[in-house]
Every structure is written in C-alpha cells, then in structure tokens.
C-alpha cells in the first residue's frame, strides 16, 4: 500500500469518526438542556477537523508536485505556508467568538473540542500500535 493511499485511508477513517461525533453533538444540542456545552464541542471539533482536512489537502498537493519530474513551482509551497496561517486564524477566531459570546459558547469547551481531534489521532495511533504487536 502506498503512502498516499494510507494517508487517504487514515483521512477517511478520521472523517467517519469526526462526523459521528459531530452528529452526536448536534443531537445533544437539539435534545438536551446542555445547549452551550454541545454547541461549544461542535464548534471546536468542526474547526479542528477543518484544520486537519486543510493539512491533508495541502500535503496531497505538495506530494503531487514533489512526485513530478519537471521543474517545481513554488506556488504549492507558498500555499502550504498560508495553510498554516489559515489554520491558526480559524482556531483563534472560534476561540474569540466564544470569548465575546459566553452565553452561546463556553471557551474551555471550545478549546476541548479543538483538542479532541488530537485525542482521536493519538488513540488511532495507539490502537494501530497495539494491533501490530
């Protein structure tokens, strides 16, 4: 299996997990009284997943450019740099939104939602390591 298809498989797996969690957060928001909590987790995880998808997409673009035998354009590498800036701005904007709207979003739970994608990735790596042993 090539590295790109492995990357695509991981992204597909993470997408399924995140979409399931987002569905649960929306369901919790609609069916319980914990609206601020579920909406905060939803906002944080949504932005975090968007950041992960941006990283995946730019890695794909840069990988395709690196595989080509001809002279490389600098544009994909510049876009990858801007991708980092975009990810930081997205995370800061959702935290800022939580700070200015404390009755709608809880800042700590938004940050926990942003961090949740990293927990998913670490657990996936742990399960993969345990399967190989």
Curated annotation (Swiss-Prot):
It comes from the Bacteria. InterPro entries: ATP_synth_I (IPR005598). It is a multi-pass membrane protein. Coiled coil: none annotated. One of its GO terms (biological process) is proton transmembrane transport. GO terms for cellular component: plasma membrane; proton-transporting ATP synthase complex. It is found in: Cell membrane. Disulfide bonds: none annotated. Keywords: Cell membrane, CF(0), Hydrogen ion transport, Ion transport, Membrane, Transmembrane, Transmembrane helix, Transport. The chain crosses the membrane at residues 16-36, 38-58, 74-94, 107-127. Belongs to the bacterial AtpI family. A possible function for this protein is to guide the assembly of the membrane sector of the ATPase enzyme complex. This is ATP synthase protein I. It comes from Alkalihalophilus pseudofirmus (strain ATCC BAA-2126 / JCM 17055 / OF4) (Bacillus pseudofirmus).
